Swiss-Prot record:
This is Dihydroxy-acid dehydratase. Belongs to the IlvD/Edd family. Its cofactor is [2Fe-2S] cluster; Mg(2+). InterPro entries: Dihydro-acid_dehy_C (IPR042096), DihydroxyA_deHydtase (IPR004404), DiOHA_6PGluconate_deHydtase_CS (IPR020558), ILV_EDD_C (IPR056740), ILV_EDD_N (IPR000581), IlvD/EDD_N (IPR037237). HAMAP family: IlvD (MF_00012). GO terms for molecular function: 2 iron, 2 sulfur cluster binding; dihydroxy-acid dehydratase activity; magnesium ion binding. The gene is ilvD. GO terms for cellular component: cytosol. It comes from Klebsiella pneumoniae subsp. pneumoniae (strain ATCC 700721 / MGH 78578).
């Protein structure tokens, strides 16, 4: 029988000092035999996805205490990728994932907490907490802040839906008037919550459902809706049950590594491909799998991407649907239900509610459930009122979207495409693979060949795009922006958005060893591995080299002979200490970022730290 971890600090005469300090936090004698549960919050006023989380930790804590546990809350950092985008701040985004994971480990292990409730929401916070949860392997439930309502405004006598990406594109488009750009900017992000499309934050919160670590509705129920409060209340109750199951009944099935098994990771990736999720999810799932000591690699993702269709298309791949529409169509369980009927899921997995996948679908899939309360929950909709308050409205759609032929979520027979929303490409400068979000690629450019325009920083590429130096047919190559080379693997949302602004969204390709925002669409290929700074062949590409992209055949090729590539590699190595570094880039890199770069691996490994360098 496992012993409560917290007993280390609450039992025995030698722990009198620790108990004295616990008493100073409000604990009494009656509390010293109870499980101590960490409420891991991420409230900050910097991030709209987290601005409403201040009081939600207290909600969870009250339920933990009522159920017989002791709740102790702490906070992690949270970086807003949208605000950090397009300047030096983006260097810090991905490294913050490791800091978040480490900070959770530090707090939980230093104080011997028995379990956790993780209150996350945005791009690197959910992955960081997920990595920590699987590293620590103590009972955990995730409950995120929820998606933002889609923005809406009237343009050309039509009401259109908006999000952050629209504001960026319109702001950079010289054909758009100042008045219209201002109107879109003021309408794009109307409420608290994670940005309203299938961007990285919402993709990851959906994947926690598929991994079994969060409750039904977590990924799609709006941040502003009153129904979301139940997820927080239930999380507080349920974590105490999970904790007692493990420590008092010796039931290891309550542990996250046994819930988020390899089968669950495969289901999560299957969901991601089917819903056209962010390419960043590949990075984060690979990293989380390593923390869980699961053999889940790019090869597994490649195999899944070849057989899973796209059943859901959401902004930024279309402006017709946002997360509020996914929820109305049944949310994550609606998509999983269609995948299950297509025979594409592992059915033996369980979730934090203790339900198997078939049991979960029977209760929560809107296409089969007989539960009116579940149907009511999935009719929770937007209010269209600007607010930063959680649970501030209770509007509902009159009906569910159960149209699986032409609705937001489709059945296998009516799939948006037989190929899924993500694909892994391989070639002679991406030997370990690269990722493209096919959900956002126009059919006309699934095969594309063009001359390279090479840039050794995102800033130089943006200047060239806005300066008219990139023209129709070009393949923009941005390198030395990987985990080590950036450092920090910047997102390239500005270059892709500006290509659209210049009318080149369907006329050019962009390739990088950096990554893309979940808001990116177009022929945008990222995560090229090995990265330039690690000796990858992307460092050998020169202006004018022809590059051939063939998504249907999962191929990407630099059209040079092996002999020419070898000669360029020899020339690069001859640079000595300057080999595999940018030639003409001025970038100030802090000590903290240099420390990150010294251990960073390429994207095909999840951009995690290289344990071998630490003797691990």
């Amino acid at each position: 029988m496992p012993k409560y971890r917290s007993a280390t600090t609450t039992h025995g005469r030698n722990m009198a000092g620790a108990r004295a300090l616990w008493r100073a936090t409000g604990m009494t004698d009656a509390d010293f035999g109870k499980p101590i549960i960490a409420v891991v919050n991420s409230f900050t006023q910097f991030v709209p996805g987290h601005v409403h989380l201040r009081d939600l930790g207290k909600l969870v804590a009250e339920q933990i205490e009522a159920a017989g546990g002791v709740a102790k809350e702490f906070n992690t950092i949270a970086v807003d990728d949208g605000i950090a985008m397009g300047h030096g701040g983006m260097l810090y985004s991905l490294p913050s994932r490791e800091l978040i994971a480490d900070s959770v480990e530090y707090m939980v292990n230093a104080h011997c907490a028995d379990a956790m409730v993780c209150i996350s929401n945005c791009d690197k916070i959910t992955p960081g907490m997920l990595m920590a949860s699987l590293r620590l392997n103590i009972p955990v439930i995730f409950v995120s802040g929820g998606p933002m309502e889609a923005g809406k405004t009237k343009l050309s006598d039509k009401i259109i839906k908006l999000d952050l990406v629209d504001a960026m594109i319109q702001g950079a488009d010289p054909k758009v008037s100042d008045e219209q750009s201002n109107q879109v900017e003021r309408s794009a992000c109307p409420t608290c919550g994670s940005c309203s499309g299938m961007f990285t934050a919402n993709s990851m919160n959906c994947l926690t459902e598929a991994l079994g670590l969060s409750q039904p509705g977590n990924g799609s129920l709006l941040a502003t809706h009153a129904d979301r409060k139940e997820l927080f209340l239930n999380a507080g109750k349920r974590i105490v049950e999970l904790t007692k199951r493990y420590y008092e009944q010796d039931d290891a099935s309550a542990l996250p590594r046994n819930i988020a098994s390899k089968a669950a990771f495969e289901n999560a990736m299957t969901l991601d491909i089917a819903m056209g999720g962010s390419t960043n999810t590949v990075l984060h799932l690979l990293a989380a799998a390593q923390e869980a000591e699961i053999d889940f690699t790019m090869s597994d993702i490649d195999k899944l991407s070849r057989k899973v269709p796209q059943l859901c298309k959401v902004a930024p791949s279309t402006q017709k649907y946002h997360m509020e529409d996914v929820h109305r169509a049944g949310g994550v369980l609606g998509i999983l239900g269609e995948l299950d009927r297509a025979g594409l899921l592992n059915r033996e997995v369980k979730n934090v509610l203790g339900l198997t996948l078939p049991q979960t679908l029977e209760q929560y899939d809107v296409m089969v459930t007989q539960d009116d309360a579940v149907k009511k929950m999935f009719r929770a909709g937007p209010a269209g009122i600007r607010t930063t308050q959680a649970f501030s409205q209770d509007c509902r759609w009159d009906t569910l979207d159960d149209d699986r032929a032409e609705g937001c979520i489709r059945s296998l027979e009516h799939a948006y495409s037989k190929d899924g929303g993500l694909a892994v490409l391989y070639g002679n400068f991406a030997e370990n693979g690269c990722i493209v979000k096919t959900a956002g690629v126009d059919d006309s450019i699934l095969k594309f060949t063009g001359p390279a325009k090479v840039y050794e920083s995102q800033d130089d590429a943006v200047e060239a795009i806005l300066g008219g130096k990139v023209v129709e047919g070009d393949v923009v190559v941005i390198r030395y922006e990987g985990p080590k080379g950036g450092p920090g693997m910047q997102e390239m949302l500005y270059p892709t958005s500006f290509l659209k602004s210049m009318g080149l969204g369907k006329a050019c390709a962009l390739i990088t060893d950096g990554r893309f925002s979940g808001g990116t669409s177009g022929l945008s290929i990222g995560h090229v591995s090995p990265e330039a700074a690690s000796g990858g062949n992307i460092a050998l590409i020169e202006d004018g080299d022809m590059i051939a992209i063939d998504i249907p055949n999962r191929s990407i090729q630099l059209q040079l002979s092996d002999a020419e590539i070898a000669a360029r590699r020899e020339a690069q190595e001859a640079r000595g200490d300057q080999a595999w570094t940018p030639k003409n880039r001025q970038r100030q890199v802090s000590f903290a970022l240099r420390a990150y770069a010294s251990l960073a691996t390429s994207a095909d490994k999840g951009a995690v730290r290289d344990k071998s360098k630490l003797g691990g």
